């Protein structure tokens, strides 16, 4: 933005204003950089550029960055630790991976759901989509990988071991803090006892299981 040195603020784009604000803050050689809604109202490309800049500053300058945001995708992209606040108090805090893998508080779960395609199952159920019209004995299950490994072939393992048919509705795997985290929403079709044993097995290997709907 050196070519904008003589420009008025009104002549700058949102991204240029943010870069200027960051440069101004760095002029005093701080140990901590406070960024309050640093990506608010920016387009996706500019948001990505600002986050890359902040990550570069953190790595090259050893700068601690405190980021205030309502955008959980931003938290997922750049942060190593996070604190969730509600009504002016911290209700949950910890490692970003653990917060996304196993949120404890209702407000945290609602924030995390905004970043996951798996939450689309709730819309399908509300709209009574044909995709979620269950036959007798079927269940809709949501799996969530809680370990720092999301590589096990769960669907084939469960199907073979417990003689259950699993139809995948939603699935996702993403990287948070250099660790994979994944989830599936499936329709399980089989004997009640077999499904119950499968759920117990998944819990035993630290895969979170939620029964969303039963027929």
Where are these regions (language model features)?
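Conserved ABC ATPase signature
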Residues: 8-12, 16
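A short, proline-enriched helix->beta-strand linker immediately N-terminal to the Walker B motif
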Residues: 27-31
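Catalytic Walker B motif of ABC-type/P-loop ATPase nucleotide-binding domains
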Residues: 33-36
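Helix N-cap at the start of a conserved alpha-helix in ABC-type nucleotide-binding domains
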Residues: 44-46
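A short, surface-exposed alpha-helical micro-motif characterized by mixed small hydrophobic
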Residues: 75-77
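ABC ATPase "signature
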Residues: 93-94, 102
